[in-house]
Design a protein with these regions (language model features):
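Gram-positive cell-envelope targeting signals
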Residues: 1-75
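Solvent-exposed, non-transmembrane regions of membrane-associated and secreted proteins
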Residues: 41-45, 51-268
Protein backbone atom coordinates (compact mmCIF):
# COMPACT_ATOMS: atom_id res chain seq x y z
CA UNK A 1 0.00 0.00 0.00
CA UNK A 2 1.37 3.37 -0.90
CA UNK A 3 1.89 5.74 1.98
CA UNK A 4 1.57 9.47 1.80
CA UNK A 5 4.41 11.32 0.08
CA UNK A 6 5.72 12.85 3.33
CA UNK A 7 5.73 9.54 5.21
CA UNK A 8 7.61 7.72 2.48
CA UNK A 9 10.20 10.43 2.32
CA UNK A 10 10.67 10.29 6.08
CA UNK A 11 11.13 6.51 6.00
CA UNK A 12 13.63 6.81 3.19
CA UNK A 13 15.64 9.36 5.17
CA UNK A 14 15.58 7.13 8.26
CA UNK A 15 16.74 4.17 6.20
CA UNK A 16 19.42 6.32 4.61
CA UNK A 17 20.59 7.64 8.02
CA UNK A 18 20.67 4.12 9.39
CA UNK A 19 22.75 2.96 6.44
CA UNK A 20 25.15 5.87 6.81
CA UNK A 21 25.54 5.18 10.53
CA UNK A 22 26.23 1.51 9.88
CA UNK A 23 28.70 2.46 7.17
CA UNK A 24 30.31 4.98 9.49
CA UNK A 25 30.57 2.34 12.23
CA UNK A 26 32.12 -0.10 9.79
CA UNK A 27 34.62 2.49 8.60
CA UNK A 28 35.40 3.44 12.20
CA UNK A 29 35.85 -0.23 13.09
CA UNK A 30 38.16 -0.70 10.10
CA UNK A 31 40.18 2.36 11.09
CA UNK A 32 40.46 1.13 14.69
CA UNK A 33 41.58 -2.30 13.50
CA UNK A 34 44.08 -0.68 11.16
CA UNK A 35 45.39 1.57 13.96
CA UNK A 36 45.70 -1.43 16.27
CA UNK A 37 47.55 -3.30 13.55
CA UNK A 38 49.85 -0.31 12.97
CA UNK A 39 50.48 0.09 16.72
CA UNK A 40 51.22 -3.62 17.04
CA UNK A 41 53.61 -3.50 14.09
CA UNK A 42 55.27 -0.41 15.56
CA UNK A 43 55.71 -2.13 18.92
CA UNK A 44 57.15 -5.21 17.22
CA UNK A 45 59.51 -3.00 15.21
CA UNK A 46 60.67 -1.12 18.31
CA UNK A 47 61.06 -4.39 20.24
CA UNK A 48 63.05 -5.91 17.36
CA UNK A 49 65.20 -2.79 17.11
CA UNK A 50 65.91 -2.93 20.86
CA UNK A 51 66.89 -6.60 20.58
CA UNK A 52 69.13 -5.78 17.61
CA UNK A 53 70.82 -2.95 19.52
CA UNK A 54 71.30 -5.19 22.57
CA UNK A 55 72.79 -7.92 20.36
CA UNK A 56 75.14 -5.45 18.66
CA UNK A 57 76.09 -4.06 22.06
CA UNK A 58 76.95 -7.53 23.36
CA UNK A 59 79.05 -8.26 20.27
CA UNK A 60 80.80 -4.89 20.26
CA UNK A 61 81.26 -4.55 24.04
CA UNK A 62 84.55 -6.51 24.26
CA UNK A 63 85.96 -4.65 21.24
CA UNK A 64 85.04 -1.29 22.76
CA UNK A 65 86.64 -2.26 26.08
CA UNK A 66 89.78 -3.48 24.30
CA UNK A 67 89.98 -0.23 22.36
CA UNK A 68 89.80 1.79 25.58
CA UNK A 69 92.40 -0.49 27.20
CA UNK A 70 94.73 0.01 24.23
CA UNK A 71 94.32 3.80 24.44
CA UNK A 72 94.96 3.62 28.18
CA UNK A 73 98.11 1.51 27.82
CA UNK A 74 99.48 3.75 25.07
CA UNK A 75 99.03 6.69 27.43
CA UNK A 76 100.78 4.70 30.18
CA UNK A 77 103.75 3.99 27.90
CA UNK A 78 104.13 7.66 27.00
CA UNK A 79 103.96 8.57 30.67
CA UNK A 80 106.45 5.81 31.51
CA UNK A 81 108.97 7.16 29.01
CA UNK A 82 108.48 10.78 30.11
CA UNK A 83 108.64 9.95 33.83
CA UNK A 84 111.67 7.70 33.36
CA UNK A 85 113.53 10.39 31.46
CA UNK A 86 112.65 13.11 33.97
CA UNK A 87 113.47 11.06 37.08
CA UNK A 88 116.63 9.63 35.54
CA UNK A 89 117.85 13.13 34.70
CA UNK A 90 116.87 14.52 38.10
CA UNK A 91 118.22 11.62 40.15
CA UNK A 92 120.61 9.46 38.09
CA UNK A 93 122.10 7.88 41.23
CA UNK A 94 118.75 6.34 42.16
CA UNK A 95 118.35 4.68 38.77
CA UNK A 96 121.96 3.53 38.86
CA UNK A 97 121.23 1.83 42.21
CA UNK A 98 118.12 0.21 40.75
CA UNK A 99 120.11 -1.17 37.83
CA UNK A 100 122.76 -2.55 40.20
CA UNK A 101 120.10 -4.19 42.36
CA UNK A 102 118.55 -5.87 39.32
CA UNK A 103 121.96 -6.97 38.08
CA UNK A 104 122.90 -8.36 41.51
CA UNK A 105 119.58 -10.20 41.67
CA UNK A 106 120.27 -11.86 38.31
CA UNK A 107 123.74 -12.89 39.45
CA UNK A 108 122.34 -14.31 42.68
CA UNK A 109 119.95 -16.51 40.68
CA UNK A 110 122.98 -18.07 38.98
CA UNK A 111 124.81 -18.61 42.27
CA UNK A 112 121.90 -20.34 44.02
CA UNK A 113 120.78 -22.17 40.85
CA UNK A 114 117.30 -20.62 41.17
CA UNK A 115 116.68 -22.74 44.24
CA UNK A 116 113.28 -21.13 44.98
CA UNK A 117 111.93 -21.57 41.47
CA UNK A 118 109.86 -24.57 42.53
CA UNK A 119 108.05 -22.56 45.22
CA UNK A 120 104.74 -21.32 43.73
CA UNK A 121 104.30 -18.84 46.60
CA UNK A 122 107.54 -17.10 45.65
CA UNK A 123 106.34 -16.16 42.18
CA UNK A 124 103.85 -13.51 43.28
CA UNK A 125 106.07 -11.42 45.54
CA UNK A 126 108.20 -8.89 43.64
CA UNK A 127 111.87 -9.29 44.46
CA UNK A 128 112.44 -5.53 44.09
CA UNK A 129 110.06 -2.82 45.30
CA UNK A 130 110.02 -0.19 42.58
CA UNK A 131 108.16 2.21 44.88
CA UNK A 132 111.41 2.62 46.80
CA UNK A 133 112.88 4.12 43.62
CA UNK A 134 110.02 6.52 43.00
CA UNK A 135 108.12 4.27 40.56
CA UNK A 136 104.69 4.57 42.15
CA UNK A 137 102.70 2.71 39.49
CA UNK A 138 105.00 -0.33 39.71
CA UNK A 139 105.61 -0.52 35.96
CA UNK A 140 109.09 -1.87 35.20
CA UNK A 141 108.73 -1.40 31.44
CA UNK A 142 106.61 -2.87 28.71
CA UNK A 143 106.57 -5.66 26.17
CA UNK A 144 105.72 -5.18 22.50
CA UNK A 145 104.80 -8.04 20.16
CA UNK A 146 104.13 -6.65 16.65
CA UNK A 147 102.76 -9.87 15.11
CA UNK A 148 100.09 -9.91 17.85
CA UNK A 149 99.50 -6.14 17.62
CA UNK A 150 100.14 -6.12 21.35
CA UNK A 151 101.76 -3.83 23.90
CA UNK A 152 101.49 -4.59 27.61
CA UNK A 153 102.89 -2.95 30.72
CA UNK A 154 105.41 -5.15 32.51
CA UNK A 155 105.28 -5.60 36.29
CA UNK A 156 107.57 -7.38 38.74
CA UNK A 157 105.94 -10.37 40.46
CA UNK A 158 103.27 -12.61 38.93
CA UNK A 159 100.46 -11.87 41.37
CA UNK A 160 96.84 -11.59 40.30
CA UNK A 161 96.74 -7.80 40.64
CA UNK A 162 99.68 -7.34 38.28
CA UNK A 163 98.41 -9.92 35.80
CA UNK A 164 95.00 -8.24 35.66
CA UNK A 165 96.75 -5.09 34.43
CA UNK A 166 99.31 -6.55 32.02
CA UNK A 167 102.23 -8.97 31.83
CA UNK A 168 104.44 -9.88 34.78
CA UNK A 169 107.99 -11.03 35.37
CA UNK A 170 107.91 -14.33 37.22
CA UNK A 171 109.81 -13.91 40.47
CA UNK A 172 112.81 -16.25 40.72
CA UNK A 173 113.53 -15.62 37.04
CA UNK A 174 115.74 -12.85 35.64
CA UNK A 175 115.00 -9.13 35.87
CA UNK A 176 114.16 -7.26 32.62
CA UNK A 177 117.64 -5.90 31.90
CA UNK A 178 119.04 -8.68 29.72
CA UNK A 179 122.62 -9.86 29.93
CA UNK A 180 124.55 -13.10 29.68
CA UNK A 181 123.04 -16.02 31.64
CA UNK A 182 119.56 -14.53 31.98
CA UNK A 183 116.07 -15.81 31.23
CA UNK A 184 113.12 -13.65 32.23
CA UNK A 185 109.83 -15.55 32.27
CA UNK A 186 107.04 -13.17 31.24
CA UNK A 187 103.62 -14.49 32.19
CA UNK A 188 100.18 -13.22 31.18
CA UNK A 189 96.65 -14.55 31.06
CA UNK A 190 94.89 -15.58 27.85
CA UNK A 191 92.85 -12.41 28.13
CA UNK A 192 89.88 -10.62 29.64
CA UNK A 193 86.86 -8.93 28.07
CA UNK A 194 88.77 -5.63 28.23
CA UNK A 195 92.16 -6.88 27.01
CA UNK A 196 93.33 -9.82 24.92
CA UNK A 197 96.69 -10.14 26.77
CA UNK A 198 98.39 -13.35 25.46
CA UNK A 199 95.20 -14.76 23.86
CA UNK A 200 96.74 -14.74 20.38
CA UNK A 201 100.16 -16.05 21.42
CA UNK A 202 99.91 -18.86 18.86
CA UNK A 203 100.36 -16.24 16.13
CA UNK A 204 104.04 -16.09 17.11
CA UNK A 205 106.27 -18.14 14.83
CA UNK A 206 109.98 -18.95 14.74
CA UNK A 207 111.89 -15.83 13.71
CA UNK A 208 109.31 -13.28 14.90
CA UNK A 209 110.62 -10.46 17.08
CA UNK A 210 109.45 -9.12 20.43
CA UNK A 211 110.67 -6.02 22.24
CA UNK A 212 111.25 -5.39 25.94
CA UNK A 213 111.59 -1.77 27.07
CA UNK A 214 112.99 -1.08 30.55
CA UNK A 215 114.13 2.12 32.27
CA UNK A 216 117.32 2.29 30.20
CA UNK A 217 116.80 0.77 26.76
CA UNK A 218 114.67 -1.27 24.37
CA UNK A 219 115.91 -4.84 23.83
CA UNK A 220 115.06 -6.99 20.82
CA UNK A 221 114.49 -10.75 21.08
CA UNK A 222 113.72 -13.31 18.39
CA UNK A 223 111.51 -16.39 18.76
CA UNK A 224 113.71 -19.51 18.65
CA UNK A 225 111.46 -22.28 19.91
CA UNK A 226 107.88 -23.02 21.00
CA UNK A 227 106.86 -25.75 23.42
CA UNK A 228 103.76 -26.99 25.26
CA UNK A 229 104.43 -28.37 28.75
CA UNK A 230 102.60 -29.44 31.88
CA UNK A 231 102.46 -26.93 34.79
CA UNK A 232 104.90 -28.92 36.93
CA UNK A 233 107.73 -28.85 34.35
CA UNK A 234 109.30 -25.84 36.03
CA UNK A 235 112.82 -26.63 34.81
CA UNK A 236 111.68 -25.55 31.34
CA UNK A 237 111.97 -21.88 32.34
CA UNK A 238 115.37 -22.06 34.00
CA UNK A 239 118.32 -19.93 32.89
CA UNK A 240 120.30 -21.50 30.05
CA UNK A 241 124.04 -21.06 30.30
CA UNK A 242 125.53 -18.39 28.08
CA UNK A 243 122.18 -17.14 26.76
CA UNK A 244 120.22 -13.89 27.07
CA UNK A 245 116.57 -14.98 26.93
CA UNK A 246 112.95 -14.08 27.47
CA UNK A 247 110.38 -16.87 27.80
CA UNK A 248 106.70 -16.05 27.31
CA UNK A 249 104.37 -18.21 29.40
CA UNK A 250 100.58 -18.55 29.35
CA UNK A 251 97.84 -21.13 29.91
CA UNK A 252 97.01 -23.65 27.19
CA UNK A 253 94.86 -24.66 25.42
CA UNK A 254 92.60 -21.63 25.37
CA UNK A 255 90.22 -21.31 27.21
CA UNK A 256 91.49 -24.10 29.50
CA UNK A 257 94.61 -24.12 31.69
CA UNK A 258 95.83 -27.68 32.15
CA UNK A 259 98.98 -27.01 30.10
CA UNK A 260 101.45 -24.17 29.59
CA UNK A 261 102.40 -22.59 26.27
CA UNK A 262 106.04 -21.45 26.17
CA UNK A 263 107.70 -19.22 23.59
CA UNK A 264 111.49 -19.10 23.94
CA UNK A 265 113.12 -15.91 22.64
CA UNK A 266 116.82 -15.02 22.41
CA UNK A 267 118.43 -11.59 22.35
CA UNK A 268 119.28 -10.23 18.90
Amino acid sequence: RCCSGGGCKENEEKTKDKGQKEKSREEKSKKEKKMKRVRKQRKLFIFGLILLLIGCGILLYPHILQKFYKIKTESMFRQFEETTENVRDANPEKYARLYEEMKNYNEELIKNNQENLADPYAYANPAIRLEEYGVEDGIAGYIKIPVMDLELPLYLGANEENMSKGAAQLTETSMPIGGNNTNMAVVAHRGYSYAKMFREIEKLKIGDEIFITNFWETMTYKVERIEVISPDEIDKIRIQEGKDMVTLVTCHPYPHNYQRYLVYCERV
